[in-house]
């Protein structure tokens, strides 16, 4: 094969994300080879390339032909299901690869798998990147947020491609070299955990407005549209306003009311919560959002619980607080509660990233992470520019909660926040995300907590000792003996 005919890059795994990313790369002027084990997907991609502008896409039908169709040093992106399929794909291609060639895994992979593969690739003289890709199918086609971590040389080899393919915002393309090892995958995992929190908080805002405020879907669509022109401007708020407007094609009313209330998940939210526990980082908002997905899955149990508790005398309280509600004030209160809760959720995610960065010596740039999330990805929001500036002001910021700008905003919003949570509790509406965020804020801001009593209990039953506030050292007390003596 003549050198001139070789592709600049290759992509294997032509499900929706893979196809769209390949076409995005080709559209930016980079000839690309594509491969899929099910060859009909190759033909489908070639057909789309022809229709979408005669894009420079070369279809390959065997691992050998695929690898050899790419110019050296070769860069191969793989977008297949995480876990064993990635290892199988790497094995199929590495047989034909040469030292200096690079593999980029663009899936949602567990970061330790990426670190293992980096080590295995190095033994073969190959370079390896684990790259988080956010934005869904639309982002993949028109500009995603990209989070590559691993070999810097591998990143440098395709930096020009990634910078053209990524979403573009006013301060640059939404891609940056994240760091060594599995940092790219870890950052994408936490991004997804934050996404869980965002979606949960929005659903709670909807629940309160609908069931306490009695707002219609039409009114909700207008409210979310209005919110999307202010501090809450974001992809998720924008699409939420669209969702409320869609009519049900099979019946009366809006489609949203006909959707079964069971939430699916892929596992990255669970990984985020597990890592938070592993690193002793409090992430209650993200954990609450995960718990809610688990509980939503218990549809039959929930329906039975509603019946049993009603028969036991529990009055139907959901929405009971709606009489005499000032709707305009409620809408404004919920907006403020959503924003304040969101700050806490992002603070938890960023603190988890900071803890992992310290543990692994990744030297993550938190302001830069916020910047590359401003476009292309699911959590893109104007709010992220504020986070970027907070970390520019103080790269060692302990928490977004104590950034002077965010602190001021939270103090201004706390009265509305408390009203919303209190109202929801009175109305029997669960708002675990907002409650967790408020409890996190109230716990974090207190100079003294009742943890002194917990330490005393631990010392009594387990002789775990305690520290004192007035003198140094570790102390143990014979609590039971002294209590009985003094009784």
UniProtKB/Swiss-Prot annotation:
It is found in: Plastid, Chloroplast; Cytoplasm, Cytosol. NADP(+) binds at residues 13-18, 36-38, 80-82, 108. It comes from the Eukaryota. The gene is PGD1. Substrate binds at residues 108, 134-136, 191-192, 196, 266, 293, 458, 464. Its main location: plastid. Keywords: Acetylation, Chloroplast, Cytoplasm, Gluconate utilization, NADP, Oxidoreductase, Pentose shunt, Plastid. One of its GO terms (molecular function) is phosphogluconate 2-dehydrogenase activity. Belongs to the 6-phosphogluconate dehydrogenase family. This is 6-phosphogluconate dehydrogenase, decarboxylating 1, chloroplastic. The keyword Nucleotide-binding does not apply. SMART domains: 6PGD. Catalyzes the oxidative decarboxylation of 6-phosphogluconate to ribulose 5-phosphate and CO(2), with concomitant reduction of NADP to NADPH. The active site is at residues 188, 195. Coiled coil: none annotated. It comes from Arabidopsis thaliana (Mouse-ear cress). GO terms for biological process: D-gluconate metabolic process; pentose-phosphate shunt, oxidative branch. Forms homodimer. Forms heterodimers with PGD2 or PGD3. It holds the Pfam family NAD_binding_2. The modification N-acetylmethionine is found at residue 1. It catalyses: 6-phospho-D-gluconate + NADP(+) = D-ribulose 5-phosphate + CO2 + NADPH. Its EC number is 1.1.1.44. It is an enzyme of class 1 (oxidoreductase). GO terms for cellular component: chloroplast; chloroplast stroma; cytosol; plastid; secretory vesicle.
């Amino acid at each position: 094969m003549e050198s001139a005919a070789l592709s600049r890059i290759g992509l294997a795994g032509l499900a929706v994300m893979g196809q769209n990313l390949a076409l995005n790369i080709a559209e930016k002027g980079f000839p690309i080879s594509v491969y899929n084990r099910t060859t009909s997907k190759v033909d489908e991609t070639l057909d789309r390339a022809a229709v979408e502008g005669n894009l420079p896409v070369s279809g390959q039908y065997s691992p050998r032909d695929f690898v050899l169709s790419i110019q050296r040093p070769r860069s191969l992106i793989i977008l297949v299901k995480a876990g064993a399929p990635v290892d199988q794909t790497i094995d199929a291609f590495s047989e034909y690869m040469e030292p200096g060639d690079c593999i980029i895994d663009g899936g949602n992979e567990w970061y330790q798998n990426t670190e293992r593969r980096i080590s295995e690739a190095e033994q073969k003289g190959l370079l390896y990147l684990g790259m988080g890709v956010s934005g869904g199918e639309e982002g993949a086609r028109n500009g995603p947020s990209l989070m590559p971590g691993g070999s810097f040389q591998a990143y440098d080899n395709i930096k020009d491609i990634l910078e053209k393919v990524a979403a573009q915002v006013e301060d640059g393309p939404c891609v940056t070299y994240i760091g060594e090892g599995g940092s790219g995958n870890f950052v994408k995992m936490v991004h997804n955990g934050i996404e869980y929190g965002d979606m949960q908080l929005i659903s709670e805002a909807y629940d309160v407005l609908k069931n306490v405020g009695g707002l219609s879907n039409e009114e909700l669509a207008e409210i979310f549209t209005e919110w999307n022109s202010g501090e809450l401007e974001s992809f998720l708020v924008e699409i939420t306003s669209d969702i409320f407007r869609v009519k049900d094609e099979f019946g009366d009313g809006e489609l949203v009311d006909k959707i079964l209330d069971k939430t699916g998940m892929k596992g990255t939210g669970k990984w985020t919560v597990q890592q938070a526990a592993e690193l002793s980082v409090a992430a209650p908002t993200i954990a609450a959002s995960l718990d809610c997905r688990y509980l939503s899955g218990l549809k039959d149990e929930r329906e039975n619980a509603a019946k049993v508790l009603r028969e036991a005398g529990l009055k139907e309280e959901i929405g009971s607080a709606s009489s005499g509600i000032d709707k305009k004030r409620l809408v404004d209160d919920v907006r403020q509660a959503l924003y304040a809760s969101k700050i806490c959720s992002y603070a938890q995610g960023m603190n988890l990233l900071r803890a992992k960065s310290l543990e692994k010596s990744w030297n993550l740039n938190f302001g830069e992470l916020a910047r590359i999330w401003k476009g292309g990805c699911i959590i893109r929001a104007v709010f992220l520019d504020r986070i970027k500036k907070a970390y520019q002001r103080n790269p060692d910021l302990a928490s977004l909660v104590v950034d002077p700008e965010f602190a001021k905003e939270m103090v201004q919003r706390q009265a509305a926040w408390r009203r919303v949570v209190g109202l929801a509790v009175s109305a029997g509406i669960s708002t675990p995300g907002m409650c967790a965020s408020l409890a996190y804020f109230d716990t974090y801001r207190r100079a003294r907590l009742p943890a002194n009593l917990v330490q005393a209990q631990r010392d009594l039953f387990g002789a775990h000792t305690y520290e004192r506030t007035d003198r140094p050292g570790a102390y143990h007390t014979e609590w039971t003996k002294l209590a009985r003596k003094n009784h």
